[in-house]
Amino acid sequence: MFCVQCEQTIRTPAGNGCSYAQGMCGKTAETSDLQDLLIAALQGLSAWAVKAREYGIINHDVDNFAPRAFFSTLTNVNFDSPRIVGYAREAIAMREALKAQCLSVDANAHCDNPMADLQLVSDDLGELQRQAAEFTPNKDKAAIGENILGLRLLCLYGLKGAAAYMEHAHVLGQYDNDIYAQYHKIMAWLGTWPADMNALLECAMEIGQMNFKVMSILDAGETTKYGHPTPTQVNVKATEGKCILISGHDLKDLYNLLEQTEGTGVNVYTHGEMLPAHGYPELRKFKHLVGNYGSGWQNQQVEFARFPGPIVMTSNCIIDPTVGSYDDRIWTRSIVGWPGVSHLEGDDFGPVIAQAQQMAGFPYSEIPHLITVGFGRQTLLGAADTLIDLVSREKLRHIFLVGGCDGARGERNYFTDFATSVPDDCLILTLACGKYRFNKLEFGDIEGLPRLVDAGQCNDAYSAIILAVTLAEKLGCGVNDLPLSLVLSWFEQKAIVILLTLLSLGVKNIVTGPTAPGFFTPDLLAILNEKFGLRSVTTVEEDMKQLLSA
């Protein structure tokens, strides 16, 4: 086992990365190794998808499957070894079908990629785990060095984050053949184990640029189906009655669940990255979408244990449900998996609803506590002139984007302390689950404009980018000249690709934390600092002083 893709990875003087019987996320060595094997199979599939396009062959089933299966290897998504192997077998079957199509056009068609002919050696998981050792990401570290390995992983993990957003977009009917072509090209190239530093740096920027397009079509999918988010108050306390909790990012799953629970007497609560769903008109119209429950994903083993109803996980993040003994009432969807828990195939939530009706639910309603969400792209752009006016009248000094992933590390209290230390004449724009560090606190307003503005899920970084570009255009300056600072918390691969997106767009002087990615060497950190001004958090006082004086 070698996995260094998330922020909580093991860090020792001897090196970074989880390499024992179990990773910090709870992933076993078996599952981790089989995910490496799956990635190799997907690289072979992408290699033939690239070749097929040379013959004018585009298979949408392949284009849809490849990023979805890659998504299953993202942190806290799928811990179920047999399902991981199932994805690998499906990838190989699709690859062979593509290969046959190419050969039907050109009898001499061939693919030079080293992953292009990969076959699984056995049906036995132990044998497959031994085969997977050939594809451990750090297997040639001694030959290539830590810097090249770090850049390879930056590209692999960044592409993994983009693949997740591609799947979210596709679920909503949004896709782009040019994006698929670019994805396959990069995925296939990474399967050649590249070792050119400049080429890898260029690839990282290409992934960022590609992901900007992915976030654009994802934004289009969400707003076309569910309307543009508008500011909405959400209750974060319990309401009497039977209940279901839904977590993850998939708004379509939430919509289907709301449709199917309407009139049943079962209330629905959002959790984690589902919180922004309350801002969408077509979702909040359901009166039994009664509120948001819980806090950051890392607290779920305590909070889910206390929730008196079933729980549906639509995407990341799931952690061991046996710890809180709620594994008999947690349900996984799509690419999510945990051994032994119930998995929903298709869009029928009937079994979940039946379980909710058999459970007690909340015995009474608590005193409401309302927070505001729903500052989507349209709302943000509508406020651009107000922001400019406040800046011109020296009522608004600075905007801080404080957001990103949450996690268990104690150092993440930095982001709470930072948000509460922001001066009263400054605004806080937030997104993703890092907001749970401070989103239930009171921040007041500036001439009626809330000082805490919740822009949505992690992918809604797109809205923040569009706002920044609009403000810069109206003020006749560059984005980096705005009174705007980005203070980002990271945890997994979606955060990595959003960072690459920002860097590829030329955004500089981003501050990240609580720690640097474990695959970043001192040399790579120095390169990113020199090229982009990227740096790690220090202390709240020092960072605040530096950002306000920039």
UniProtKB/Swiss-Prot annotation:
Cofactor(s) essential for the protein: [2Fe-2S] cluster; hybrid [4Fe-2O-2S] cluster
The protein's Enzyme Commission number: 1.7.99.1
UniProt keywords, alphabetically: 2Fe-2S, Cytoplasm, Iron, Iron-sulfur, Metal-binding, Oxidoreductase
Record GO cellular component, one term: cytoplasm
Binding sites annotated in the UniProt record for hybrid [4Fe-2O-2S] cluster: 249, 273, 317, 405, 433, 458, 492, 494
Protein function: Catalyzes the reduction of hydroxylamine to form NH(3) and H(2)O.
PANTHER family reported for this sequence: HYDROXYLAMINE REDUCTASE
Protein family according to the UniProt entry: Belongs to the HCP family.
Record-given protein name: Hydroxylamine reductase
Organism: Salmonella paratyphi A (strain AKU_12601)
